[in-house]
């Protein structure tokens, strides 16, 4: 009888563990699917063409001070958005390249982006450089400070890599920035 009870207790414990694991795994699968859904939706989002500023989030640059393919894609997306907005609304956008200088970089990420913007035909007076930040939170905080110096009610967008849009949007929101991202 003791052996039978022990087996029943072991079976009960096994069932409890199985049910608990199924609940945990179901929760994790749901969390993963929800995260993927949010990231895909954010990456495919195109901001409204009513923006005053576009913050271009920095990333590592090449040794010669030029943009890596990843950073070039972010910058090209911002340029494309600015051109499309101009066509749609006749409203010029101000570009804010954002990113500090790494120890192994010749110039700041922001300066490298600015150089590329000018090379691509963007007028220097439409570029405000934020070159102190070392992470996405600082990109947003320091860029917001620059924007607030001229326009506290500005409509803002940001450009980053598609897989980074959702996370950057959350960080921007936590920094008190109402903006739309693109990637």
Regions found by a protein language model. Give the residues of each.
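A structural signal for short, hydrophobic/glycine-enriched beta-strand patches
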Residues: 36, 43-183
């Amino acid at each position: 009888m003791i052996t039978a009870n022990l087996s029943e207790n072991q079976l009960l414990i096994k069932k409890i563990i199985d049910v608990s694991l199924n609940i945990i795994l179901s929760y994790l699968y749901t969390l993963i699917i929800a995260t993927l859904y949010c990231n895909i939706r954010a990456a495919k989002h195109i901001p409204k063409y009513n923006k005053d500023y576009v913050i271009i989030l920095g990333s590592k640059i090449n040794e010669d001070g030029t943009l890596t393919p990843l950073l070039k894609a972010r910058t090209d997306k911002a340029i494309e958005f600015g051109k499309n907005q101009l066509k749609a609304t006749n409203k010029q956008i101000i570009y804010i390249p954002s990113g500090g200088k790494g120890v192994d970089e010749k110039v700041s990420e922001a300066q490298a982006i600015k150089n590329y913007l000018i090379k691509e035909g963007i007028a220097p007076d439409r570029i405000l450089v934020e070159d102190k930040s070392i992470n996405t939170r600082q990109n947003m905080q320091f860029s917001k400070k620059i924007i607030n110096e001229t326009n506290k009610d500005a409509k803002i967008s940001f450009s980053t890599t598609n897989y980074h849009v959702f996370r950057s949007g959350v960080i921007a929101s936590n920094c008190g920035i109402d903006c739309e991202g693109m990637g």
